[in-house]
Amino acid sequence: MTSEAFEPSAAAAPAPPGRSARARSFNSAAARYAAHRPSYPPALFDALEELAGRPLAGSRVADIGAGTGIATALLHARGAAVLAVEPGDGMAAQFRRLHPGLPVVRGDGNALPLADHCADLLTYAQAWHWTDPARAVPEALRVLRPGGALALWWNINALDVPWIAEESARVARHFGVDTAAERRDIDALGADPGGLPRLTRREVRWSRRVPIDTHLANLASRSVFLVSDEERTAAFLTEQGDHLRNAFPDGTVEETYDVVLLVATAPS
């Protein structure tokens, strides 16, 4: 598939690459992001097909805020005709290196470079929170065909797993961030979709077992680490690595996630 399958909009130019320092921070760490971030389980895409009311195979899908293409590649593997939309220079360049056969265009959810009613499905994997919903909701409804679906999802740390909760608390103390805010924000979006049609929610728990160094590299690819002082980040990663090696002497950890999926259907 080529990007010509989605007709570009003459009026919409690609938006600037990010709304904040945290959003822009991924561009300098794109290779690390691609190498160490978790993927998504097959059950997520089964749930997506169920809630969207259509198979991915043969669907015209635009993956917005595609990053390095983790979700884009999985959508393609399920048979979707998928186009990636990514605002960041570094992330888009890494996408092209990893997925030379998949189309990617520059833009973001606030000003989609796509024609009206051209997509069966819009996906935002770990990306909706970087948009301005007052702009992104009308854009999504403009680009979706009647009856098409908007799908938002996030890998959320499973804070009922003791070692993950302890690590999250350490991150919060060290960097002065609210590590539980992500789930609260998603819960709030589900309760008040802010102009979106009614959102249907599904959660999928999954896990991956990785070496401790891979887990630490995953941590270091998160925006709160990327915008922090390098010395402060290095100190935390060293301390946390020592703690994990004491707790898990075999050198591996099981990262457990809840993928929270929200799906809305455009009016017919």
What does each model-found stretch correspond to?
Residues 3, 188-268:
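Conserved Class I S-adenosyl-L-methionine
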Residues 58-59, 117:
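Nucleotide donor/acceptor-binding cores
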Residues 135-210:
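Conserved catalytic/acceptor-binding region of the Class I
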Residues 62, 68-111:
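Class I SAM-dependent methyltransferase SAM/SAH-binding core
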Residues 110-122:
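A short acidic, Gly/Pro-enriched loop at the edge of an enzyme's catalytic core
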